[in-house]
Regions:
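Acidic, Ser/Pro/Thr-rich low-complexity regulatory regions
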Residues: 20-21, 107-213
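Non-catalytic, surface beta->alpha helical segment in thiol-disulfide oxidoreductase systems
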Residues: 84, 89-123
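Local sequence-structure signature of Cys/Sec-based thiol-disulfide redox active-site neighborhoods
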Residues: 19-56
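Short loop/turn motifs at secondary-structure junctions and domain boundaries
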Residues: 78-82, 131
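Thiol-based oxidoreductase modules, predominantly thioredoxin-like and allied folds used
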Residues: 34, 57-74
C-alpha cells in the first residue's frame, strides 16, 4: 500500500489498535490522525477537516477514543501530547508536526497548515458510514404531528449534542441550523426559548428535510 497509489480511496481509515496506528503512519509518510470523542464537537471539528480534504491529498486515520482506547493512548504516548477529543494531528515520517483540538479546529487554524499539503488534481469527497436517518425520522414525526414543539426541540437538541458522527461540513451546518449550538444551553434546556421563536418551526423542519434529501 503506497500513498501515491491509494491516496484517492484510502482517505479515512479506522485505527482500532496501537499496531494499526503504527502501520498507518508507516504506510503514509504524510498523514493525519483524528481522535473522535462522544459529542457534537467531534462532528463540528471533522466537518472543518472535511472541507480541506476535498481539495488536498491527506490520508486520515480516525480513532474513536472510547471504543479504541489503547490506540488513543498509544498516540498520546508516542507524541507526548496530552489527549483531547476531538483532536487532529498531522504526521510526517512518523513524527507529529501539528496538533489542534476541540473548538480550536477551525478553518483559520487549518488553512496555513494545509497550504503545505499537496493539492488534489480534482476535488474529492470523504465517505463515512454515519447517516442522518435518526434526524429524518424525528423530523418526519414532528411534521406529521406525532411530536409536540417542545418535545421535538428537546429530543432534537439532545440528539445533536450527543452526535459524534464524522460528518461533512454541509451536513453539520444543515443539522445545526434549527437550534444552533447546544453548548449555549448547558444551564438548562429552557434557555433555548420558545421552539417557534426563530420562525414557523414546521416550515423550517420541512425545508431542512428537503435539503437533506
Amino acid at each position: 500500500m503506497t500513498q501515491t497509489a491509494d491516496a484517492e480511496k484510502q482517505v479515512l481509515v479506522p485505527l482500532t489498535t496501537p499496531e494499526e496506528v503504527d502501520q498507518f503512519l508507516q504506510d503514509y509518510p504524510l498523514a493525519a490522525v483524528f481522535k473522535a470523542g462522544t459529542c457534537h464537537k467531534t462532528m463540528q471539528g471533522f466537518g472543518v477537516l472535511e472541507t480541506f480534504l476535498q481539495e488536498h491529498e491527506l490520508p486520515v486515520g480516525f480513532i474513536r477514543v472510547v471504543d479504541w482506547r489503547p490506540a488513543s493512548n498509544h498516540v498520546a504516548e508516542m507524541t507526548g501530547i496530552v489527549h483531547h477529543s476531538p483532536q487532529l494531528m498531522i504526521f510526517k515520517d512518523g513524527q507529529v508536526q501539528f496538533e489542534v483540538n476541540n473548538w480550536d479546529i477551525t478553518p483559520e487554524v487549518l488553512e496555513p497548515v494545509f497550504a503545505q499539503v499537496p493539492a488534489r488534481s480534482t476535488s474529492g469527497s470523504v465517505q463515512t458510514d454515519d447517516n442522518i436517518e435518526p434526524y429524518r425520522r424525528l423530523m418526519r414525526d414532528f411534521v406529521d404531528g406525532k411530536v409536540s414543539d417542545w418535545a421535538f426541540q428537546d429530543q432534537y437538541v439532545t440528539m445533536f449534542r450527543d452526535d459524534a458522527s464524522l460528518r461533512s461540513q454541509r451536513e453539520f451546518e444543515l443539522l445545526s441550523r434549527l437550534f444552533g449550538d447546544p453548548d449555549a444551553y448547558h444551564g438548562g434546556l429552557h434557555q433555548l426559548g420558545q421552539p417557534q421563536e426563530r420562525g414557523e418551526l414546521k416550515d423550517r423542519v420541512q425545508q431542512l428535510l428537503t435539503e437533506l434529501g
